[in-house]
Amino acid sequence: LTTNLVVADSERTEKTICLAVTPALKAYGIGGRARLFEVVQRVNEINADRRRKAPGGKFTGASSDKKELEAHPELELEFITAKPRMALYKKISVEIYNIYLKYIAPEDIYPYSVDEVFIDATHYLDTYKMSAREFAGAMIADVLKETGITATAGIGTNMYLCKIAMDIMAKHIEPDKNGVRIAELDEMSYRRLLWQHRPLTDFWRVGQGYAKKLEANALYTMGDIARCSLENEEMLYRLFGVNAELLIDHAWGYEPCTIAEIKAYKPENSSTSSGQVLQSPYPYEKALIVIKEMAELSTLDLVEKGLVTDQLVLDIVYDVENLKYGGKYGGEIVSDRYGRLAPKPAHGTANLGRYSSST
C-alpha cells in the first residue's frame, strides 16, 4: 500500500480509466477512477514541486515507494502502471471468498466488487467470543496465510459506515506488522471525525455531479448537509429529488438497508448497458459500425438473460482531439469534467412501442 501504482492498460491510450489506484497515490489527490492522463498530469505537477524543493534543484534518482520518497526529497516520484489481469483477479477473489466461508454463511456475505465484500458479523461475535475488530483481524490473517494478500477493513454499525470506515479512514492509517489496516465507526464517531472532511467525493455515492451541485449551494461537507436537512430540507429534495433521502441519511451516518434486504430484493425492471472507449476519433462510418456491433451484443445479452426491452438509449461523448482537425467540427462546444473544451456530448432515446429482443 506504500507503492505508487495504478492498474490500467497503458497500451490502449492515456484516456483509459484506471481500475485501481493505491492509497500512496490517492494521497496526492488522484481519484480512484482517474484516467491515466490525469495521473500523468498530477505526477508531473508533484515532480515540478519536488524539483523546486530538492537540494540543488535537481533529482538524483527516482522511486515509487512512498516512505522512500518522504525520506529523500532528492528523488523523483515514479509510479507503476500494472496491466489488468481480470481472470487472475477473479480466481484469487473466489479463493478469498471461500476463506470467508470458513467463518461466515454465504447469506451474510455480499460481494461488492472483485476485491471487496460486505459481511454482516452481527450474529457471529458471540459464537466466536471476539470483538468485531478481533473477528475481522482473524479473517484477514487467514487470508494472508493462505494467499499472501493483506487487506483493509472498515467496521461500522451499518453498511454505509463500514464502507466509509474503510475508504476514508482505514486506507489512510498506519498498517500493523502484516500490512493490515482496520478502522471503526458508529454514528456518533462518524459525525465527530468526518463531518468536516473534504472533499465530498471521498464519500460513498457522492460523485462529481452531486459535489458540484452541493458546493454551488454552499454545502461543502457532510456536516453542512446534515445541518441543511434540519433547516432547509426542501432545497435538498429540489436538487436531488427522491435521492435526497439517501443523501440525508448518509450525512447523519444512517443506512437502513441490510445485506439480507439486498439479497431479498427483486427488481421490477432490469437494464443492461455496454460501453467502449475508442483509441482515436472515428469518422461517422466507422463509428456507426461500432454502434451496430454494440447493438448486436446487447441483443445477445438480452436473449441470454431472457429479457426484452421497449426502450433504447445511446450516449456519445466526444474527445478534445475532435477540435484539432482543421476546424471541421461546427457544432456546440462545452467544457468537459476536466475543464477542457470538447464537442457537446450527444444523447438519444428511442421508444419502440413494444417489447422485443430482436435487432
Where would I find each of the regions flagged by the language model?
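Basic, low-complexity intrinsically disordered segments
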Residues: 1-359
